[in-house]
Amino acid sequence: MRIHILGICGTFMGGLAMLARQLGHEVTGSDANVYPPMSTLLEKQGIELIQGYDASQLEPQPDLVIIGNAMTRGNPCVEAVLEKNIPYMSGPQWLHDFVLRDRWVLAVAGTHGKTTTAGMATWILEQCGYKPGFVIGGVPGNFEVSAHLGESDFFVIEADEYDCAFFDKRSKFVHYCPRTLILNNLEFDHADIFDDLKAIQKQFHHLVRIVPGQGRIIWPENDINLKQTMAMGCWSEQELVGEQGHWQAKKLTTDASEWEVLLDGEKVGEVKWSLVGEHNMHNGLMAIAAARHVGVAPADAANALGSFINARRRLELRGEANGVTVYDDFAHHPTAILATLAALRGKVGGTARIIAVLEPRSNTMKMGICKDDLAPSLGRADEVFLLQPAHIPWQVAEVAEACVQPAHWSGDVDTLADMVVKTAQPGDHILVMSNGGFGGIHQKLLDGLAKKAEAAQ
């Protein structure tokens, strides 16, 4: 079959393209911005990429067009597909029909930690000989790709609540039909497509509804929003994580780089890994519980996590200059900012200085939905620098004023980088947080710090 993918350079759609190639289909695709690393990955798989959406790319006519969720009516290719009656479907629908239908699906859903937890579950199964397939929203550190067909019945998927396509406004995850479901947490997010928390809970309950009776749902017992969702009705086995639940994690070190796994009060495993932070410990516990449902002993799962490498942009060390370390993180919601800063604080100790540099870039952030929670979430940083994005209906100066520590802002990335370099001293740790490229600020900081070191000699 010849498949053409509109919006191929996103992580999810690029992953589907790789799976389609592994299934033996001829695959082409287009995107408004064809750029590495995804373009390189796809071209290596023999997938032809086209820049832009000129309708001529649909000649000769493909057998099927997979339409990404960023595509809208008015797009020349979308209009041509509809006009010529070319068969089309959304990415999640294709995944269900061509990949997941006969598989044991382990899905990871929730507001935070999906990519990390899905990566952990995949690595546990891989290390324990299960050879799973996977589709993950970032490239897990232990693998070279974000999607793989696998060689067994088991398939791990990052289950996103975002919508499928302009013609299917349900959450992607309703197509995945999981047998093992991790619900990490639930908060209001994606304010561009959801009106309120109830609207998201409704979609999550659609997901809960399609887990089989002998399937299993693993969720944290202290999450009020999930508790309300589960109270709408659940027909599957449940395992709870947390103090009153079946599973607990007990820190053995302050930074959570070593921890015990407890099941029904008994120690069943111990994790020693390169990750830090209680949020990662929570993610790891979820992955261990999910792996047990498919047959992996918790002790084996815990051992496997010892060699787990996280996806890029998860408290990733980007470099060091003038004695200052620069980290990068994908955090783009107050809860994630709080967890990432807590993890870094645990890693570097209570007296080291942490400088937080934040770009409010997600749609929810830009709309100002969670702006009042930003200053408290930044509390563990010693100094804060904020970028003021253009064309948003609120001012980051409000957040700077609400911060208890010194806080500064600028509307220009270069100016902001200069301000950070000026204040940073040897021994400091800079944490850059954004779900985008942040104007290449990481390298600007490292270059600026190196120049500062030269000037001081």
From Swiss-Prot:
One of its GO terms (molecular function) is UDP-N-acetylmuramate-L-alanyl-gamma-D-glutamyl-meso-2,6-diaminoheptanedioate ligase activity. ATP binds at residues 110-116. Its main location: secreted. One of its GO terms (biological process) is cell division. Pathway: Cell wall biogenesis; peptidoglycan recycling. Optimum pH is 8.4. Keywords: ATP-binding, Cell cycle, Cell division, Cell shape, Cell wall biogenesis/degradation, Ligase, Magnesium, Nucleotide-binding, Peptidoglycan synthesis, Secreted. Its cofactor is Mg(2+). Its EC number is 6.3.2.45. Disruption phenotype: Enzyme ligase activity totally absent. No effect on growth. Belongs to the MurCDEF family. Mpl subfamily. This is UDP-N-acetylmuramate--L-alanyl-gamma-D-glutamyl-meso-2,6-diaminoheptandioate ligase. It comes from Escherichia coli (strain K12). The gene is mpl.
